[in-house]
Amino acid sequence: MESNNNEKPYVIGLDMGGTNSIFGIVDQRGTIKAQTAIKTGAYPDINDYVAAAVEALQPALDLVGGIGQIRGMGIGAPNGNFYTGNIEDAANLVWRGIVPIAQLFEDALGVPARVTNDA
């Protein structure tokens, strides 16, 4: 039986910048349990970026017992739209136009993802 999402003790946080993307796995008190980073601009294709992020996250996920321990993901991104889950025309990112970042991470990780503006 799959556990209730409210019982999962950790969340993934992503601070996305034009140069670096820093990921942290935190508990309910905000204590960082694991972290990793990738170069944001090294991936001109958003799908390659998400794949690299998931790969970089794997050792951190292993430290906390795997993706089954993750409640969701929060993403702070330039021009992030909380209502749509998209990054919209961010000048300091390599991807242009509308980028459905929350949906891409939901699909890749299988957990809910939300985005907010961190310009």
Task: Tell where the protein language model's regions lie, with residue ranges.
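Residue-level structural signal for beta-strand termini and adjacent loop
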Residues: 26, 37-38, 93
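Residue-level signal for inorganic ion chemistry
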Residues: 23, 38, 75
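Short, well-ordered beta-strand segments
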Residues: 13, 74-76
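Glycine-rich phosphate-binding loop and adjoining helix at the ATP-binding site
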Residues: 50-54, 69-72, 79-119
